[in-house]
Amino acid sequence: MVIIVGSGAGGAILAMELAKSNVPVTIIEKGKYIDSKDAFNYYDKYNGSVDLLTATCVGGSTMVSMANMVRALDEELYDYGINLSEEYDYVENLIKVHGLDDTHIGKGTQLFLDAAEELGLNPIKMPKAIYEEKCIQCGQCAFGCPVDAKWTGKHFVDIAIENGAEFIDEAEITDLITEDNRIKGVKFIKNGKEEILHSDTVVLSAGAIGSALILRKIGIDAGRELFFDPFVSVGGVIKDINFNTEVQMAGLVVGKNFVLSPHYSSFIPSKIGGDAEPKDILSIMVKTSDECKGYMTGDGDVVKINTINDIRYLAEGAAVAGFILEKAGVNPATIASTVYRGAHPGGSAAIGKFVDSNLETEIKGLFVDDASVLPISPGKPPILTILALSKRLADYLIG
């Protein structure tokens, strides 16, 4: 039997692939099994020093993601002997990654694409796993899709269960059981009672913070380095644009040190003031990689140290976003920015430091399979890369 801790992108596809190959699987999920429309209620809360977007529930942060699917860190992973080209092809076909049909490209997104093209920025449609036949174009992706029109880890968990996997939710790992440098099982709390589950193969897919905290329970000092992708949203007024109800982040500009994507932020109207309403805002997310100078405290709080480059790259991206907005017809006098936030934490148990190229730790049979293992910050949505790494691990475990 394989025990998988967590059901986000990594754990979900791993469970599905193993179960479909008749490998006994038990998934232990700290959060609840929920409907996608309720995912907004399961965002995690961190200390006041950092605004980091993650969720704890079935499917993990995929439930509140924009379903953006871009390849990332190809060269960096290849340096560790990891070539994901076949796995990328497999996953992209499996979840039907594509740029949205024009029917689902709203007016604000089209203005972004056209303005960026005029400025020579080579915009493209964002590769996504959203299914137009179900999508109602409500702009609520980050709150949990009300009609289940995007891919989430929950979809793969359900398939795993259909193929015989056991799913235990609202269960928190309290310890790992090891013997002679080998994994032997896990201890967890369910309904206030500690239980033990034995296995010679345990895979931690609890996210960069959760997996690192579990590793610390057996003396593996993970989480002393941590990245997340810093971002701000820059926006201004175009009266009655109604961008806030469009499919978000449906376009993409890839710069040298940042990425830009049209994204409505509810914080923008208050930053602008006056009579600006949500329906009047066109805004752009500016996202960059960071230099992995964050870390986790003993109780899992996140501390982020901003470097000069972190701030410089965000400023560069924000300036370019301003040019795009003005070209798109935004009144430049109304342009404002949100505060700094973060998404996609990772690097807490990186390949080459805590796991090998097969994602196995120094403890035989104990693997890590989530953004923890990414060697550097991608500065892009990492879900597709995690899915590809997980498919590779599934093939390895199946043998």
Put a short name on every predicted segment.
Residues 137, 141-144, 316-379, 383-387:
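A glycine-rich dinucleotide-binding beta-alpha-beta segment and adjacent secondary-structure elements
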Residues 2-27, 32-34:
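N-terminal Rossmann-like FAD-binding beta1-loop-alpha1 element of flavoenzymes
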Residues 62-64, 68-136:
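Rossmann-like flavin
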